[in-house]
Amino acid sequence: LTTTTTEMLQAIQNGDLQKINSLFEYFLMNEEPEAQYEIADLFMQYGYLNEANRVYEHLQFIFPNEAQLSIDRASVLIELGEEDEALQLLMGIDNEAPEYPQSLLLLADYYQMQGLYEVAEQRINEALEIMPHEPLLKFAKAELLFETGRFSEAVRLYEELHEKEKNVAGVLLSTRLAEVYRAGGGYETALDYYMEALEEIVTPDLLFGSGYAAFQCEKFELAIKQLEDLKELDPDYFSAYLLLAESFAMLEDNKNAYKVILEGIKRDEYEKSFYLFAGKIALKNHLTDEAIDHLQQAIALDPEYMEAILVLMSIYAGEERYSDIIALYEDLKNEEFDWSALYPIVADAYSEEEQVNRAYEIYKLAYNEFKEDASFLSKYCYFLIEDGQRHEARKIALQLNALQPYEQQWLDLLDTLE
């Protein structure tokens, strides 16, 4: 390497843009094209896209018929957002040139990024007609099929490649196979490929994927092992905490489940699903006050978090904290959030608090949604009886009898209401 090339190399590696600029013109005018080409690639690797483009443009001026330079420069131009100029370069490559399939592959990548999947597939298929056994082209098509949800077609290509080699384009094929089987719901096979991939390289994503697949296969002990390893490798991989806690819960190890989710909350105090799970599992550990606190925090993060609201109201109902149910409901109303699933609990709360008119109003709102629900209708019927609305109560009793004709209590109730 010449002194100038060596200095340019060091400036790039050190991120010294001022030095790069001071060397640039001399470098273009005096260095050999081979050195310039290598430095252009290095510019790309380090993110100096404008500098890479200038070098490729200079080399194109010297070698105007070199197709590889058109492809390399087009790749830079796409990164710079100069798509029209990039496409013009790629379209100008002769279809008889050895580099033509490579240009088609870059075009396919561009169209895929734009969401034009059919056009991208056409370009890859055209390249495959020229080079039907080229692993990079098969891999590119598999990637496109995977991205568009055509999992079985993607699997066929990935497995065909996997039979011959472990890696393509720097990607471990067992990893891709694990991901595509997982995406398609084939968790047993996905787990096998995850474990194969982990023999080659251990990464947080692979550990999480294997834990998730093991969980779906109901191999909860294995899921726990993988997720514990992940937690040790990367304590800030937040998704691991919920899945690990759920794995303990599936084994009815509720104490460890609660311990893990509390660790997760310490790591990510803004994840509402952590608080929801903590509330549920605290309840299983007979920690009602803690459960309520967790659910309140979940709702504080998302005032319309339906599942957390429903669980919290159910706890309040079980604890006969009817005023808390009403307060929560009124807060939701003030936020213009209305959810019919809450009506039965809220109506019961108003009834228990002897706010009869309000209870009747909510019961009527709930009726349209729950007129096939015998439990709701039963409470509504007895509320109407207590409120002296026997005629309306009889209509509800008739519905109950129609829903459950084998229940003697509804016949007896109808006799009472006659």
Predicted feature descriptions by range:
Residues D16-L17, L49, E83, Y117, ...:
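TPR-repeat structural position
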Residues E32-E34, A67-Q68, E99-Q102, P135-L136, ...:
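Helix-start (N-cap) detector for alpha-helical repeat units in TPR-like alpha-solenoids
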Residues Y26-F27, H58-L59, G92-I93, E126-A127, ...:
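Canonical positions in the second alpha-helix
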Residues Q13, Q45, E79-L80, M113, ...:
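Register position in tetratricopeptide repeats
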